[in-house]
Every structure is written in C-alpha cells, then in structure tokens.
C-alpha cells in the first residue's frame, strides 16, 4: 500500500510517500520559521495561509522524487489534530479533495501518534511494549505503549510543555525564535554550576511534570543579573545551561520512574525536543545503567513531518480504518481515545 501523508498541524508543511513494502519513498518539508520569527512565535492565520501556498508544490515534489503518479497512490493520510484549527483544515481539505478526485480512502492521523511512531521508520525500530516520552512544544507526556492505539497515559505536564518552556524562557532572556535551539546553542558555552535551577515535581511521587516555575525562575535569575549590571552573553549562556540541565534531569528522573513502575526496559523519545542532544545523552546514560535501550527518530523526523503521518496512517489503513468524506479536524484530541489496531 502506498500512502501519501500530509502534515499541517502548526508551522511546518510536510508531505511524504510511504510504501508498506518498500518503506519511505520520498518526503519534503517547508518550515515557516522565518515567516514567524519577526513575531516571536507562530501566528495562526499566517500559518494557515502559508500551508495553502506550499501544499501542492510539495506534493508535486514528492511525486516527482518518488517517480510516482496520482494513479499509484492507494490512500491519503493527513493530520486531523491536535493543532491549530485553521492549519489542520488546510491539510484535511486537501486530503479529502484528492481522495475524492483519485477515488482512494483518506484517514485522519493523530499528530502525537505520528511522533510516537516516527522511530518505526528507522533501521532498528522499537518493539512493543515500551514507554514513550512525548516531548514537544505542545505536549509533555509519558505513555505506556502496548501496540498501535493501545496507549496508557502515565503522566503529563500540568502546565507548560517542555518545548513551550524552552521557547518562553528564551524569549524572557532576550533570545530569538525558535527558542529551543537557541537555548541549546548557548548552553554549550555555559559555565556548569554557576546557577542551579530546581527540578520541579521530582521531590514527590508521581509521573506528572510542571515547567512553568522554571520559566519564572529563569526570568528572576536574569533580572537579578541585569540589576547587578551583568547582562553579558556569558550570563545568558550560563542561564541557558542551568535551565536546560534542570529540564533534562527532570525528564530523565521521570522516565526512570516510569520504566521502574511498568517493568519495561525500552524507552521511545519523540517530538521536537527529542532532537536535543543533552536530553538524548541523559536518557542514554540512564538506560545504560538500567540495561535498557532508548529509541528515537533521526533529527529531521523529530520535528513535524509528513513521513510520520504517512507511516501512522498506513498502519491504520492496513487495519481497515478510514474516514468518511466529511472534512473534520480535532484541535484537542486525547491520544488514549484512539482505537487499537
């Protein structure tokens, strides 16, 4: 089965073609970072308009690179949620229109299920069951995964997601957008131990997260330095390192707890923040101590992309699942409500 995947949940337009026997045939992506940078964050209306502009050229690019024609497509998968409603509707409308024109089924894919399954595109994919850490700009969740659609939520952020905290903290200390990569870049030049930030909610039982306090702690630390006459680049680097270390160690502690609680040895880390090298290093060290293994997608499939949507959609289509002709999206959509495959 050949599935065309469309991703338009936020500020990346992604298109990919996946073959159930041959694997990924082609993928293309356009990032809107430069469009939104001047505003310091994603502007939903601009995101939707740019998806309209980019979608068809990217589809043509993927078909050309794969050597396929519309007649070779067996089905279409698209991100149906969660995400920005206008952006989601662009992808859903395009998918349903092509499905109608080409006489093929379409299936809406949960954006975070796409992220969760992205490591399945690698040469050594994880095997069920495993614990997944979904960590992105909109989500921070620990999930027990026993199969596709068989998800048990173990813990989640009660306020800001980790990626959101990265972006907001970067803005508070005068860094550019997107903040996550900027924090990571400056942290490489930070002085270890100059600032020590708290590890929120690690002093109590449970697997939930809270990162809004770290954002405030970072701002207060920066303001104290500025008031003392120190607004240097090195101080920004030191705060970035302290913030990143606190987030990474908090995530590592909670992942260790989740693995011990479930008795599982394999951990999947997915979502945009999974590209952070400090986080990968911390989790690899922890899994090494536990005699377990950590899995993640290659860096370009950590952020939003069409390949993960094509793969996830293919699995559900092979199980006989597909949508009706109505154009419908779900900006809020709990992943544990998905049917099993």
From Swiss-Prot:
Provide the binding site for Fe cation.
111, 115, 304
Highest taxon, organism lineage: Bacteria
* CDD domains the record matches: ASKHA_NBD_TsaD_bac (cd24133)
Reactions mediated catalytically: L-threonylcarbamoyladenylate + adenosine(37) in tRNA = N(6)-L-threonylcarbamoyladenosine(37) in tRNA + AMP + H(+)
Top enzyme category: transferase
Q: Where is the signal peptide?
A: none
Q: Record's Gene3D superfamilies?
A: 3.30.420.40
Query: Of which family is this protein a member?
Result: Belongs to the KAE1 / TsaD family.
Q: What is this protein called?
A: tRNA N6-adenosine threonylcarbamoyltransferase
């Amino acid at each position: 089965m050949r599935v065309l995947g469309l991703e338009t949940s936020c500020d990346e337009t992604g298109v990919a073609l996946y073959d159930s026997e041959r694997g990924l045939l082609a993928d293309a992506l356009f990032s809107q970072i430069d469009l939104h940078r001047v505003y310091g964050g994603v502007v939903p209306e601009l995101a939707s308009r740019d998806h309209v502009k980019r979608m068809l050229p990217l589809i043509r690019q993927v078909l050309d690179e794969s050597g396929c024609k519309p007649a070779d497509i067996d089905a279409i998968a698209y991100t149906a949620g969660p995400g920005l409603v206008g952006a989601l509707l662009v992808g859903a409308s395009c998918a349903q229109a092509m499905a109608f024109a080409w006489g093929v089924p379409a299936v809406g894919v949960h954006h975070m299920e796409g992220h969760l399954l992205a490591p399945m595109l690698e040469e050594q994919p994880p095997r069920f069951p495993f614990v997944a850490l979904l960590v992105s700009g909109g989500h921070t969740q620990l999930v027990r995964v026993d199969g596709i659609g068989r998800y048990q939520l173990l813990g989640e952020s009660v306020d800001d997601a980790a990626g959101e905290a990265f972006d907001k903290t970067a803005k508070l200390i005068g860094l550019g957008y997107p903040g996550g990569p900027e924090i990571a870049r400056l942290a490489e030049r930070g002085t270890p131990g100059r600032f020590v930030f708290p590890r929120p909610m690690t002093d109590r039982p449970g697997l939930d997260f809270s990162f809004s306090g770290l954002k405030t702690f970072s701002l207060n630390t920066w303001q104290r330095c500025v008031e003392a006459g120190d607004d240097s680049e090195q101080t920004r680097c030191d705060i970035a390192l302290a913030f990143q270390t606190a987030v990474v160690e908090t995530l590592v502690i909670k992942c260790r707890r989740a693995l011990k609680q479930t008795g599982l040895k394999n951990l999947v880390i997915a979502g945009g923040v999974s590209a952070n090298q400090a986080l990968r290093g911390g989790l690899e060290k922890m899994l090494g101590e536990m005699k377990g293994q950590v899995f993640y997608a290659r860096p370009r499939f950590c952020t939003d992309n069409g390949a993960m949507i094509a793969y996830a959609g293919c699995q559900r289509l092979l199980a006989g699942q597909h949508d009706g002709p109505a154009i419908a999206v779900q900006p809020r959509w709990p992943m544990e409500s998905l049917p099993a495959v």
